[in-house]
């Protein structure tokens, strides 16, 4: 399969650069996978697509203010984007500077704080901060908005680039499908008889990296840490027993569940995943999906195409562009039921 098969033209004006005033005010494009039928709704109408007995699985990762500005002790300015917190003081980070720092270089953080560059791991730098890193980031860090939101972060992003159920700090990008849910909607979902469960996948900056090969099969995915607990396994089992559907909120929840079921059976799992889901790959757990609109030629668009079928997905995206839907992290959403016989671009 060619990466170019997943290209579509997106007008710049459809990229959402700010969130709407209310989380649930987004639009919802519903795609019935088996038939390809589309329905244009509001996100609050999601309740109409859920059934008593269903299970919704959310990603409860918490975005950390992972972007720091500062300078080398020698004076050269730099920008740090934390990719992964290793322990209380050490992180792996991307560094943007005119000249890459060498081991032993001391970095002075704008707003207070310092770190030492310990060693380089390919594209990432291992840094040791003089004080506990998470409180430091909360104090002087900036929210790591995606590269397509071409503006500085502001105070509102601290709240809105975060789900209302975020708990476990470690992500450097939001699980954006979850941004549409407020407490009232979650309460209404539970009141309808829909169960909820939470996985954790700390979304890395690699989620925004373009696919740099021509053929999908040659792409190597970035690694991200996730955890699927026994409680989630039990909730899925109970859902299956009562005839309900597993509804994943976001592609990160899909990747978590399917990573924990690579041999066909869902089991507790904690560790790194590099799962790459593209057309032709089976789904063992997820029956329906809530997701935002993704970048052209991205691995997430490939995942959606594997779930709903390639022709159905690309037709839905064409309709979304024609109808002026808002795209990407702060944009609108889709509700998709799985296509039992999805076709790829070459079928």
Swiss-Prot record:
It comes from Pseudomonas aeruginosa (strain UCBPP-PA14). Keywords: Cytoplasm, Queuosine biosynthesis, S-adenosyl-L-methionine, Transferase. Its main location: cytoplasm. GO terms for molecular function: S-adenosylmethionine:tRNA ribosyltransferase-isomerase activity. GO terms for biological process: queuosine biosynthetic process; tRNA wobble guanine modification. It is found in: Cytoplasm. One of its GO terms (cellular component) is cytoplasm. InterPro entries: QueA, QueA_dom1, QueA_dom2, QueA_sf. The lineage of its organism: Bacteria, Pseudomonadati, Pseudomonadota, Gammaproteobacteria, Pseudomonadales. Transfers and isomerizes the ribose moiety from AdoMet to the 7-aminomethyl group of 7-deazaguanine (preQ1-tRNA) to give epoxyqueuosine (oQ-tRNA). Pathway: tRNA modification; tRNA-queuosine biosynthesis. It comes from the Bacteria. Belongs to the QueA family. It catalyses: 7-aminomethyl-7-carbaguanosine(34) in tRNA + S-adenosyl-L-methionine = epoxyqueuosine(34) in tRNA + adenine + L-methionine + 2 H(+). The keyword Cell wall biogenesis/degradation does not apply. The gene is queA. Its EC number is 2.4.99.17. Monomer. This is S-adenosylmethionine:tRNA ribosyltransferase-isomerase.
